[in-house]
Design a protein with these regions (language model features):
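Catalytic cores and adjacent flexible loops of soluble metabolic enzymes
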Residues: 1-99
Length: 99
């Protein structure tokens, strides 16, 4: 992650080859402008193979895709209205403190 901005000064399009455990670094990289993420995928971290130890499971992959989609939606929302997720949270807090 620390090299992304340096690489972007050379080439606008930068990807992340993520060999860390979990999906946090991949999620953080969205906000840094990364356009491609490479992440190892497995159905069982106990299977043989050196990459299986840090590969993500299907539930983690789903969460990563959902996070990427939400991030893209938030970035592209130029309207004055709220996206679905913002509206749901707004209802909770507006109701709580508006009384």
């Amino acid at each position: 992650l620390s090299r992304i901005s340096k690489l972007q000064s050379i080439n606008k399009e930068v990807g992340l080859s993520d060999h860390s455990n979990g999906i946090l670094s991949a999620i953080i990289s969205f906000s840094m402008g990364v356009t491609l993420i490479e992440k190892h995928f497995t159905i069982d971290n106990k299977l043989p193979g050196r990459d299986n130890k840090f590969a993500i499971l299907p539930k983690d992959f789903s969460q990563l895709v959902e996070s990427a989609n939400e991030y893209n939606l938030m970035q592209k929302n130029n309207s004055k209205g709220f996206i679905k997720q913002e509206s749901e949270v707004r209802k909770i807090y507006t109701g709580r403190w508006s009384k």
